[in-house]
Amino acid sequence: APMSLCGAMSQGYIGYDLQNAVRSELLNRGIFKPVSTVITQVRVDLFDKAFNHPTKVIGRYMTAEEAEAEEEKGNHVVEENGSYRRIIASPRPVDIYEIDAVKALIDAGQIVIAAGGGGIPVMEQGTKLKGASAVIEKDYTAAKLADMLDASTLLILTARDQMEADGKPIDALTSEEAIQLMDEGHFDEITTLPKIDACVSFVTSGEERTAIIGNLDDAYHLIRGRRGTRITK
């Protein structure tokens, strides 16, 4: 199946489970608030350099013979621990088409689940939107969504308690400090760098914004400034 279709299906079934879980938890706490999932299409640039340098590993592990068959189909493959996996492009998000729907639902008092999996990557072809064979980095789409909503806070939840540099936990960074650490290569290009980069993009795109990265289990404390790594302009 095309990657864009896989993204759409993932958004649908994960959104279904997530919105029902959130709704159930709210009702258990005596809170009556509607929860909605929005199937979200995100525009990417045809000329994004990521399409010439795919980096996102997807799919199952393959044998050398299976990998060769994938390459004959025109797909990119990379060796990983003696096996092979497919890799695809991970372009930056340019625009979010359903942003007005998300805003309308928020204004109506709903909790909105949007841009799941980084959004469905699409390109404009006249009046149509054509799915792209790509996976958008979720951190960048989260930052784009928060920016377009003019949010004051971006909260990125992960398995880490804090970001680290040289093995030392980071409590707070300005955008300039974060950029310097990125330039010096302190963050892993696959796992932590996109999170820091996305946070810098968010806080520098507006005024009085804060981005926070921390452990999922600490969300309550993170939003109150007690834990995690905070990035400001």
How would you name each of these model-derived features?
Residues A1-K233:
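C-terminal catalytic "cap/lid" subdomain
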